[in-house]
Amino acid sequence: MRHGKAGRKLNRTASHRKAMFANMAASLIEHEQIVTTLPKAKEIRPIVEKLVTLGKRGDLHARRQAISQIRDVAVVSKLFDAIASRYATRNGGYLRIMKAGFRQGDNAPLAVIEFVDRDVDAKGAKDRARVAAEAEAAEAA
């Protein structure tokens, strides 16, 4: 019997789930908005909210705990520097989930999960920087 077992399995092994949530959390913190399926969005929300609370704590131990969970030092530094200061006065509720219709291939329910006071310019910033660098290199050549 499965009494008291919280969380969805999402048809994955435990290690696959852990890796997927780490990658999704890193992407969400980096871009501040991602599109995923509704069950995955509902599962990732408490993970990222706990990471933001770690960022608000701000000490070395909290930073190491965050690194051990999402395994990307650059994303953790953004979490602790930019995001933690943005939500310093807010007690929880850092994320919102909005339903976004159904996926065409398998009709899976989609959702947009984003930070409540998100930086609109953060989404795709890395790609814009790469495209600009490639354009400069093409002009110089």
From Swiss-Prot:
InterPro entries tied to this protein: Ribosomal_bL17 (IPR000456), Ribosomal_bL17_CS (IPR047859), Ribosomal_bL17_sf (IPR036373)
Superkingdom as given in the UniProt entry: Bacteria
Entry GO CC: cytosolic large ribosomal subunit
Pfam families: Ribosomal_L17
Signal peptide interval: none
GO biological process, one term: translation
Family matches, as PROSITE patterns: RIBOSOMAL_L17
Gene Ontology molecular function terms on file: structural constituent of ribosome
Keywords, sorted A to Z: Ribonucleoprotein, Ribosomal protein
Subunit structure and binding partners: Part of the 50S ribosomal subunit. Contacts protein L32.
PANTHER family given in the database record: LARGE RIBOSOMAL SUBUNIT PROTEIN BL17M (PTHR14413:SF16), RIBOSOMAL PROTEIN L17 (PTHR14413)
HAMAP family: Ribosomal_bL17
Homology family: Belongs to the bacterial ribosomal protein bL17 family.
Protein known as: Large ribosomal subunit protein bL17
